Amino acid sequence: MTHPVIHRVTTLDLSVVRRPWLFAEQRRAEIDAHFATRQREKPKLWNGRVLIGRTPIFAGGQLSASYFEADFASFLAWRDWGFPDKDVFNGFGMGALRANDGAFALGVMGEHTANAGRIYFPSGTPDLDDIRGDALDIEGSVARELEEETGLTPADYQADAHWHCVHTGPSVAMIKILRVDMTGAALRARIKANLARQDHPELAGVHLVRARADLTASMPRFVTAFIEAQLPA
């Protein structure tokens, strides 16, 4: 994976266009077989529609890119097979919950998910619900995913004005710090209480990061790169 590069931007210009994905068309049979195998392993996986990015450009404090619609099975195969189509990227938003004592709150993904055991901020691959007109609304995507996973709504946090875009070649994580006026312990307890009320929670737990010693190998490199940049040297 490419060494993470962090771009700080204030504006996202993400258009949604109609276009074919040759990777998905040319390898359809292989993709379907791969998804069938993954679905046997994780029966709750669903082949919905997602949005994949192309041509990310960072300039003048802005990230510009175009997105197109694809099926989740094709996206999953592309990811699992080492990103064979180099012309596209996985561009998604993340809400970096930060408590008033400086702790970051990350989710531990449940065993039934495609990323079981991984630890990262609430997020999700953009889908059709995140389209506004002919544009992708990453801010809305973050708010939706955060509420679904943790129960927190925009009334519970104060969002910073800018995004930290962590670019690692096949992915761009658009991370915005969301400041919550409670301690890390209280924030974790609130999220865990919400998880206990959910019938099928996406998260299995909450992991707090206060220092580099709290980072683990279960976190994607783009997450640890972002957190390291926020913590004291």
For the regions a language model picked out, list residue spans one by one.
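N-terminal leader/linker segments that precede catalytic domains of diphosphate-processing enzymes
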Residues: 1-120, 125-144, 152-233
